[in-house]
């Protein structure tokens, strides 16, 4: 009261006023803080009446009494500022029968409060003293005529007769012998006026209230309230229990007003069936009168209300929702009545309120404007990220996901964004081979499938069983790679080399010149030996030393067949644009008889600057069945620049020509005569795929081209193997 008066600084009158029958002008006004108000302008000569009215409004506080804000004296009169209200005479045409019934009930409560609590009498209960607030409640005004029961003398009544409604004056006051009412019947004057007011409003209920209830209420009005004898008029509190005031709307309103006084069982029963009771009411009545009572902290704290009723109030009706219980309000009413209430609730920092609001944010968030979302909703939602409650943080994150679709990620997330996750469509099904059976593509697919099965299962029975014995690891690895290479070959039907991109370069052309030659498999390059050698100077020429084998028995030499496979070397590095093609013709092995030994070596130039191949006899071992192979030393010169006419990667292509030979695996199981296979020396270049020349008995020469870009290369040696129990003695010479 006092704070409201001191806080008020100014107001602005709006629009044209409404003039009451008593001559009082009512102006709508806007306060300085933006709130709405009403200003009653009295004439200066009525200052005493205004002071009395202001005094009663300040001291009497009831929901059904007009709320006082301030009183000032202006040039045009005395201004009494109250809450924003509208005269009942103006608003009556827009009210429904349920609202009128609730309004009558409000005035009844206000009079009971004056009589029982204040021991006062209003003395002017009529249509012009009743006002309708913005929330639909009826307010009793005209407090300038209020006085205590003993003070209602005939003289006082004559002084206020100018402002009183003639229809509200009881018949006893017309008698010249009237001297006043006893204090025990001080309510009789207001009871008569209230009966007259209700009687004028009853025609509105002709079709809305049952005939029995309406006739019963009319009988009470005429026989009790409008009784000419003041002693026969009962107290107004006796009307509260009449069936006229028992309807769904009024009962819901009364229950919600006294929610804090109800027990848990009463609240559970009420909210459990609230949806059924409210569904029969008009949407306008629900929006104007029930929404403010239902959307508050008290109702949000009731679990039954949150589960059974609020979901139907926190969202508008949807046109296409078959099989679902529709919401209570249309989108237009939801926008005008519910959204303002929700905006205020988002500023309430109570956990249970925020949980309910965010749980149903998808249903109503689209009805906020962009400005409301940015200035009110988003800042309030973001506060939940810093809360200590895990449930608040979790539901806040889900709500932010909803806001992203409306405000955009730049507004919700903020800051610059970068592309982190790429759009990919992985295929989890293998491409089936639909090519013809005899086509080259079909052969390639078959080879790849055969090789992949072996690579995936190295423990399969593809390799000979004698590899699992006491065979050196380097020899076992070489033989396994030969088996891998043989699996990828299909004979003379397909002579194209399968090439795969190396180091990101896929422009490698086919190096097969002879269509009848055996195809070169795409073997995996061998791993480098574990020994370390000092780097050799770059300018040294490359040389290959072929060491002759020791003489063996005739029986052993007849069954000895050293085979190797042809391997294509591809250099995957494209940073060097040079190529040096070197050819080496290897002579066929010469049979050794028991009468002596002969050594032959073919000297083949590898490059223009390379030295001839030199052969030197090897030292015999102490044991007859062992042989010694000296690791050759190979050095390369720095590659020269090749002509610029070659394509990308062609300078690293190694071309090999050879005649087709029979499957080398057939010789491995030729007979069971124990023998010692002489070692074969293979040239291993780093990062290149190797192909081993397979000499036959007819002294077939092969052509091998390789790149000499590296300064030093390593050599691997083929190991000799024999029957189980035989040992081989190895000596490292000339390192």
Swiss-Prot record:
Lipidated sites in chain (N-myristoyl glycine): 2
Membrane-spanning segments: none
Region feature Disordered, mapped onto this chain: 505-545, 604-648
Compartments it resides in: Cytoplasm; Golgi apparatus; Cell projection, Lamellipodium
HEAT repeat copies, ranges: 194-249, 285-323, 333-370, 372-409
UniProt key word Calcium: no
GO cellular component: cytosol; endoplasmic reticulum; Golgi apparatus; Golgi membrane; lamellipodium
Positions of disulphide bridges: none
UniProt PTM comment: May be myristoylated; myristoylation may target it to Golgi compartment.
InterPro entries tied to this protein: ARM-like, ARM-type_fold, CIK-Related_Protein, Kinase-like_dom_sf, Prot_kinase_dom
UniProt keyword terms in alphabetical order: Cell projection, Cytoplasm, Golgi apparatus, Lipoprotein, Myristate, Phosphoprotein, Repeat
A GO term, aspect molecular function: identical protein binding
UniProt free text on domains: The protein kinase domain is predicted to be catalytically inactive.
Family: Belongs to the protein kinase superfamily.
Protein's UniProt name: Protein-associating with the carboxyl-terminal domain of ezrin
């Amino acid at each position: 009261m006092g704070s409201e008066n001191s806080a008020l600084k100014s107001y602005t009158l709006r629009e044209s006023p409404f003039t009451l029958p008593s001559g009082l002008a009512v102006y709508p006004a806007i306060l300085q803080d933006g709130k709405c108000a009403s200003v009653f302008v009295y004439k200066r000569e009525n200052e005493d009446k205004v002071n009395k009215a202001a005094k009663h409004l300040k001291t009497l506080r009831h929901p059904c009494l007009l709320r006082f804000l301030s009183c000032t004296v202006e040039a045009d009169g005395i201004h009494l500022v109250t809450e924003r209200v509208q005269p009942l005479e103006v608003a009556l045409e827009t009210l429904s029968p349920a609202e009128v019934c609730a309004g009558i009930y409000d005035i009844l409560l206000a009079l009971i409060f004056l009589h029982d609590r204040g021991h006062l009498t209003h003395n002017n209960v009529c249509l012009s003293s009743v006002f309708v607030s913005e929330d639909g409640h009826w307010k009793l005004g005209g407090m300038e005529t209020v006085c205590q029961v003993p003070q209602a003398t005939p003289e006082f009544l004559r002084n206020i007769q100018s402002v009183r409604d003639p229809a509200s004056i009881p018949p006893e006051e017309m008698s010249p012998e009237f001297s006043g009412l006893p204090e025990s019947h001080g309510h009789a004057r207001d009871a008569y006026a209230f009966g007259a007011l209700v009687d004028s409003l009853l025609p509105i209920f002709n079709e809305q209230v049952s005939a029995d209830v309406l006739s019963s209420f009319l009988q009470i009005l005429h026989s009790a309230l409008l009784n000419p004898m003041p002693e026969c008029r009962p107290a107004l509190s006796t009307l509260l229990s009449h069936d006229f005031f028992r309807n769904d709307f009024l009962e819901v309103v009364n229950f919600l007003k006294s929610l804090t006084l109800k027990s848990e069982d009463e609240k559970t029963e009420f909210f459990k069936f609230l949806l059924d009771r409210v569904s029969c009411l008009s949407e306008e009545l629900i929006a104007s009168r029930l929404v403010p009572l239902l959307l508050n902290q008290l109702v949000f704290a009731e679990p039954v209300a949150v589960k059974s009723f609020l979901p139907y109030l926190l969202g508008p009706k949807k046109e296409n929702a078959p099989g679902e219980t529709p919401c209570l309000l249309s989108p237009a009413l939801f926008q005008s009545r519910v959204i303002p209430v929700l905006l205020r609730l988002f500023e309430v920092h109570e956990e249970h309120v925020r949980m309910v609001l965010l749980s149903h944010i998808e249903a109503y968030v689209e009805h906020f404007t962009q400005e409301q979302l940015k200035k009110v909703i988003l800042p309030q939602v973001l506060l939940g990220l810093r809360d200590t409650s895990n449930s608040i943080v979790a539901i806040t994150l889900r709500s932010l996901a909803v806001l992203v679709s409306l405000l955009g990620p730049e507004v919700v997330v903020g800051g610059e964004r970068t592309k982190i996750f790429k759009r990919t469509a992985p295929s989890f099904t293998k491409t089936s081979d639909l090519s013809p059976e005899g086509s080259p593509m079909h052969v390639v697919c078959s080879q790849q499938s055969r090789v992949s099965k072996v690579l995936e299962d190295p423990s399969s029975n593809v390799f000979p069983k004698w590899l699992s014995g006491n065979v050196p690891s380097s020899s076992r690895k070489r033989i396994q790679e030969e088996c891998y290479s043989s699996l990828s070959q299909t004979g003379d039907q397909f002579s194209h080399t399968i090439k795969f991109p190396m180091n990101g370069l896929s422009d490698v052309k086919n190096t097969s010149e002879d269509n009848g030659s055996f195809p070169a498999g795409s073997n995996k390059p061998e791993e480098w030996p574990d020994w370390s050698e000092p780097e050799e100077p770059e300018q040294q020429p490359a040389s290959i030393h072929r060491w002759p084998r020791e003489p063996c028995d005739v029986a052993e030499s007849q069954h000895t067949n050293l085979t190797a496979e042809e391997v294509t070397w591809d250099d995957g590095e494209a940073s060097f644009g040079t190529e040096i093609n070197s050819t080496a013709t290897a002579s066929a092995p010469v049979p050794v008889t028991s009468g002596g030994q002969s050594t032959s070596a073919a000297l083949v130039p590898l490059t223009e600057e390379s030295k001839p191949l030199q052969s030197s006899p090897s030292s015999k071992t102490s044991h007859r069945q062992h042989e010694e192979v000296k690791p050759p030393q190979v050095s390369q010169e720095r590659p020269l620049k090749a002509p610029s006419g070659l394509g990308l990667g062609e300078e690293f292509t190694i071309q090999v020509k050879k005649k087709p030979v029979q499957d080398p695996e057939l010789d491995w199981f030729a007979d069971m005569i124990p023998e010692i296979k002489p070692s074969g020396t293979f040239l291993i270049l780093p990062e290149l795929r190797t192909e081993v020349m397979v000499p036959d008995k007819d002294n077939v020469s092969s052509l091998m081209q390789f790149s000499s870009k590296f300064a030093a290369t390593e050599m691997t040696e083929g190991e000799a193997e024999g029957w189980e129990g035989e040992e081989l003695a190895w000596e490292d010479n000339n390192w």
